[in-house]
A protein has these predicted regions:
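Metal-cofactor-dependent catalytic cores
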Residues: 1-262
Length: 262
């Protein structure tokens, strides 16, 4: 029997997750509170409330050291706190001045990293904190979608690498145990039920360089992409699947049963 064993959402695109006992899936197919904020380069032409590709933002793909920062987002009070270890770097309301201060603090942090997208591109400054804090919109793809992986696949990847791999590298919303390795990949084009909700599984999730970043140290320390293509014999490096609700959204919970809809 397969069950949900962990749920995550990511208030700020490309930053640390928030572990949850319950997620609310909107009718549109996104998780409430997920990717509601982003840190965008000054020279990115997209409007603040519009979707854009992650290459126009500070994100793990270009700044692996972001993984060291911890995020606490007060969705009701619209307040964001960023910390590094025991040090609070910023604790600001999402008003214009608070956004400016968060952007400045993050720019200072990022510029001190050995690998960063700002030192050679001053035109990307100042950093802009975008998003209203309520609408989930800064996903890898404009369509959003809920993502799910099986821990059986994670264990297979660990065996190929010969070491433990944190599932946080893959930034899924839903982690499931009780599946065989890569079983979830066979769900593409089919429907599953999680608790009381039914989902259509629409595609496998192609991975990027962000998965190489250690979620604790912020170092690129594992060759995830080449392991998936060379040792797992994948044409494209994929891990997890993307899905949308069939019909209306609703809540999913840790402990919910997961099964194919026959």
């Amino acid at each position: 029997m397969a069950n949900v064993v962990a749920l995550y959402r990511y208030p700020v695109k490309g930053f640390a997750p928030e572990a949850c006992e319950t997620l609310f899936v909107l009718d549109e197919g996104r998780v409430a509170g997920d990717r509601v904020l982003g840190i965008r380069f000054a020279d990115t032409e997209a409007a603040d409330d519009a979707w854009s590709r992650k290459h126009g933002m500070v994100a793990l793909i270009n700044t692996p050291g972001l993984a060291r920062l911890r995020v606490a987002f007060d969705a009701k009070g619209l307040r964001l706190r960023l910390s590094l270890g025991k040090s609070v770097l910023a604790d600001e309301a999402l008003n214009p001045e608070g956004r400016r201060r968060i952007g400045a603090v993050l720019a200072d942090y990022v510029l001190k990293l050995d690998e960063n997208p700002l030192t050679e591109h001053p035109e990307r400054l100042p950093l802009r904190v975008v998003g209203d804090g309520r609408s989930p919109r800064y996903h890898d793809e404009e369509s959003g979608r809920v993502t799910l992986h099986g821990r059986g696949s994670l264990r297979a990847l660990e065996a190929a690498l010969g070491m433990e791999v944190s599932e946080l590298r893959f930034r899924s919303n839903v982690a499931v145990d009780g599946l065989s390795a890569w079983e979830e990949q066979n769900w593409v084009g089919r429907k599953i039920r999680i608790g009381m909700l039914e989902f259509a599984v629409v595609k496998p999730k192609t991975r990027c360089l962000a998965t190489h970043a250690n979620p604790t140290t912020g170092e690129r320390d594992l060759p995830i992409l080449t392991t998936l293509t060379q040792k797992m014999d994948q044409e494209n490096p994929t891990f997890a699947v993307a899905m949308v609700p069939s019909g209306s959204g609703g809540e999913i919970h840790v402990g919910d049963h997961v099964a194919l809809v026959e």
